[in-house]
């Protein structure tokens, strides 16, 4: 199963993939035997709320960030290096070791059903929000996702509604989501830069009033 945090900074995994299990690690916290944490500063909070029995492995170019005053990953293993290459190497190693294909197919079928349930719940939330006044952020995000083409790039600086944006706008391609790094006010500049780099793709910026006012 692949779980994205509610505050993911980029588009990490296609949301229409059957192994995408939403944005909460809680359902897997006590049953997982291995948790691979990829480029995540705080995968669960508080730090004591991590998996009860899993081995925790962190993969990151810089797992211990000097710019953070406090960071408590409490991992059992740190794999420092290029993330994409590390994942490829791990996948190759698993293939060489061999896996129980029957068990894999059973687990995949179970996760596919879970993926469908999560999606159905999301659709029900969107339907419920559709006729609310003023416009509900859930419906706004859903309408954007339905109305924009598949190659749209979204820029997020909404802050307080970031988790809703992650859940209700569908993106399935790499580089479909970017977020401002640092303080408020960088969203519009980031959007203009991305549009210059991706002239043939629509770029949609979602920005809160605070971020808009702070924009230089």
State where each predicted segment sits.
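Glycine-rich, acidic loop regions that bind phosphate or pyrophosphate groups
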Residues: 4-114
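Short, basic, glycine/proline-bearing loop/turn elements
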Residues: 8-17, 31, 122-130, 175-180, ...
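A short, small-residue-rich loop immediately preceding and capping a beta-strand
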Residues: 28-39, 200-214
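Short, glycine/acidic-enriched loop or turn micro-motifs at the edges of active sites
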Residues: 63, 160, 212
């Amino acid at each position: 199963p692949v779980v994205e945090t509610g505050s993911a900074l980029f588009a990490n995994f296609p949301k229409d993939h059957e192994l995408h299990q939403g944005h909460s690690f809680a359902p897997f916290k006590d049953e997982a035997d291995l948790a691979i944490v990829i480029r995540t500063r705080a995968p669960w909070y508080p730090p004591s709320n991590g998996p009860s029995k899993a081995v925790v492995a962190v993969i990151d170019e810089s797992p211990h960030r000097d710019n953070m005053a406090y960071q408590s990953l409490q991992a059992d293993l740190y794999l420092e290096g290029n993330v994409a290459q590390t994942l490829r190497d791990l996948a190759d190693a698993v293939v060489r070791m061999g896996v129980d294909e029957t068990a894999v197919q059973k687990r995949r079928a179970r996760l596919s059903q879970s993926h469908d349930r999560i999606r159905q719940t999301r659709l029900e939330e969107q339907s419920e929000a559709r006729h609310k006044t003023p416009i509900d952020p859930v419906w706004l995000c859903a309408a954007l996702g339905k109305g924009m083409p598949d190659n749209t790039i979204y820029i997020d600086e909404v802050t307080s509604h970031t988790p809703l944006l992650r859940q209700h706008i569908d993106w399935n391609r790499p580089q479909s989501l970017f977020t401002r790094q640092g303080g408020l006010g960088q969203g519009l500049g980031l959007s203009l830069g991305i549009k210059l780099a991706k002239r043939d793709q629509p770029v949609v910026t979602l920005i809160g009033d605070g971020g808009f006012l702070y924009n230089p």
